[in-house]
């Protein structure tokens, strides 16, 4: 028996196909490009499936944050949107980019920052005084942060007699909360250019100064009123509504989506898949479950789903009306251009199924 155990141990050590703990690949905060401090998080190591490029969390202070999975197939779209934002804001390559909140890098994806040649860095501490210190000492060309946080720091600089040390002509992306309009006047004293960047951890950056950064963005009627539009990306609703104004965004008159007047959509839209280019209803149902799990969006599959269609057809339906009753009102989104993100998640699902486990040990059905 002892000899048999010895042989088994040698086989496990020398010929095992599964990795040991030391052989497992590892993604650290540094390899993800987000190795900066925050006051709202604990650093935790987790086992992340290979089919996800990375895991992050939604932001928010009034409800628990959702875990967000970003698939490998989504990275190209995030990169294109991020590079479009840099181009629109005239961000030069190889500049110094101060990121005041490390998880914001996940919205760009570190790949986008690398492609644009930016040298990004973080605060020593996640605090206003550390931000002010970094501005004065590091002299960034570009930065991103919450608008009121930035405004307060610039006002602090004036009170402390440090205004002369603030770098001039900084390009400042504001994100995370609706734009604090008072920042515009404060920033003007330092010849800063303020940009209102809207997006989320789930889908990346979506607009800059009210101008869409992706081709698959659609605006549909919102229950918030006739002046508002529900924001939809790639066929998936954001649950955010914005005024649409021909007068334009305060940072750019060409931008018609007034992102600094955001309102939460209530009731939220659900997505019904009516037609798919997939040949299998079962795969479509798996895509719906995937989107719920990693993006937090409710997608349902029509029992009469048309498979092997020439296009994807999605209906967005409020779960209940404003009066609390069910409603049949829906808004249709179809075609490759407007359902691109949905198609990207289908691509991710198909890639997952190609590497699906066949060993009966892992089957959840018998």
UniProtKB/Swiss-Prot annotation:
It catalyses: holo-[ACP] + acetate + ATP = acetyl-[ACP] + AMP + diphosphate. Keywords: Cytoplasm, Ligase. The keyword Iron does not apply. It is found in: Cytoplasm. It comes from Malonomonas rubra. GO terms for molecular function: ligase activity. This is ACP-SH:acetate ligase. GO terms for cellular component: cytoplasm. Its EC number is 6.2.1.35. Acyl-carrier protein (ACP) acetate ligase of the biotin-dependent malonate decarboxylase multienzyme complex (EC 7.2.4.4). Involved in the conversion of the thiol group of the ACP-bound 2'-(5-phosphoribosyl)-3'-dephospho-CoA prosthetic group into its acetyl thioester using the energy from the hydrolysis of ATP.
């Amino acid at each position: 028996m002892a000899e048999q155990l010895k042989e088994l141990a040698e086989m496990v050590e020398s010929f095992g196909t599964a990795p040991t703990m030391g052989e497992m690949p590892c993604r650290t905060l540094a390899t993800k490009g987000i190795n900066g401090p925050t006051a709202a998080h604990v650093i935790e190591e987790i086992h992340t499936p290979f089919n996800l490029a990375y895991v992050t969390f939604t932001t928010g202070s009034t409800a628990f944050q959702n875990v967000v999975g970003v698939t490998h197939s989504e990275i190209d779209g995030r990169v294109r949107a991020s590079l479009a934002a840099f181009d629109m804001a005239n961000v030069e390559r190889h500049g110094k980019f101060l990121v005041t909140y490390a998880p914001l890098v996940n919205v760009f994806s570190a790949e986008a920052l690398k492609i644009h040649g930016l040298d990004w860095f973080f605060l020593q501490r996640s605090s206003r005084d550390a931000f002010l210190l970094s501005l004065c000492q590091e002299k960034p060309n570009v930065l991103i942060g919450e608008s009121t946080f930035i405004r307060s720091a610039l006002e602090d600089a004036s009170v402390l007699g440090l205004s002369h040390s603030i770098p001039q002509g900084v390009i400042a992306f504001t994100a995370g909360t609706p734009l604090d309009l008072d920042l515009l006047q404060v920033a003007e004293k330092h010849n800063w250019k303020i940009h209102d960047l809207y997006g989320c951890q789930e889908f990346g950056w979506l607009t800059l100064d009210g101008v869409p950064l992706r081709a698959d963005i659609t605006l549909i009627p919102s229950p918030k009123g006739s002046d508002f539009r529900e924001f939809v990306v790639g066929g998936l609703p954001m649950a955010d509504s914005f005024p649409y104004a021909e007068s334009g965004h305060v940072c750019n008159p060409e931008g018609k989506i007034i992102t600094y007047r955001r309102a939460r959509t209530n009731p939220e839209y659900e997505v019904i898949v009516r037609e798919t280019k997939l040949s299998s209803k079962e795969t479509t149902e798996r895509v719906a479950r995937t989107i719920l799990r990693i993006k937090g969006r409710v997608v349902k599959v029509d029992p009469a789903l048309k498979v092997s269609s020439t296009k994807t057809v999605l209906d967005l339906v409020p779960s209940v009306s404003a009066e609390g009753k069910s409603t049949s009102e829906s808004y249709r989104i179809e075609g490759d251009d407007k359902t691109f993100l949905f198609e990207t998640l289908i691509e991710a699902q198909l890639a997952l199924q190609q590497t699906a486990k066949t060993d009966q040990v892992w089957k959840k059905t018998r």
